[in-house]
Structure formats: C-alpha cells, structure tokens
C-alpha cells in the first residue's frame, strides 16, 4: 500500500509532464518500474536538492536552425510516404 502522499506526488508529476517540465529521473522510474512500483520507488528516495537553472533567451540563429530542421524532417517524411514503401 502506498502512503497518502503518493497522490500528491503523482499530481505533481502529472502536472510537470503536462507542462513539459518532467524530470527524466522520475519519468524513467515510472517507465522502468511501472506506475505503481515507480511511485513507490520515487517516494522512498529523498528528493534531490533543487538547483535553479538560469533561463537563457534563444538567439535568432537557433530559431532559424529549428525551422530548417523541421523543414528537412517534413521533406524526409513526405519523401518516404510518396515512395509507397509501407510496412504492415
């Protein structure tokens, strides 16, 4: 049986996932152990010290590279789809 604090921990983890801010360690425990056992493992461990990260503003060149990457990936997907090589 998991402690009552498990629900609060789950809701915190769920909110972090929905906001795209989930900790890789927490998600790894859930994926590896499953939800029930993963929560038990995470609750049993002491929380790591929190470090505040300084958020840097993205530069213009990063945005250009992101657009180029998305464009290249879209072209790769379209090229793969038009070849008709489907695996079922």
UniProtKB/Swiss-Prot annotation:
Keywords: Plasmid, Signal. The keyword Signal applies. Residues 1-24 form the signal peptide. To Rhizobium NGR234A y4oL. This is Uncharacterized protein y4bB/y4pI. It comes from Sinorhizobium fredii (strain NBRC 101917 / NGR234).
């Amino acid at each position: 049986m998991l402690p009552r604090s498990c629900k609060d921990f789950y809701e915190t983890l769920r909110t972090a996932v929905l906001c795209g801010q989930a900790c890789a360690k927490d998600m790894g425990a859930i994926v590896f152990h499953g939800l029930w056992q993963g929560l038990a493992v995470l609750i049993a461990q002491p929380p790591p010290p929190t470090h505040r990260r300084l958020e840097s503003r993205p530069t213009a060149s990063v945005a250009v590279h992101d657009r180029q990457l998305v464009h290249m990936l879209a072209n790769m997907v379209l090229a793969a789809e038009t070849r008709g090589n489907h695996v079922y």
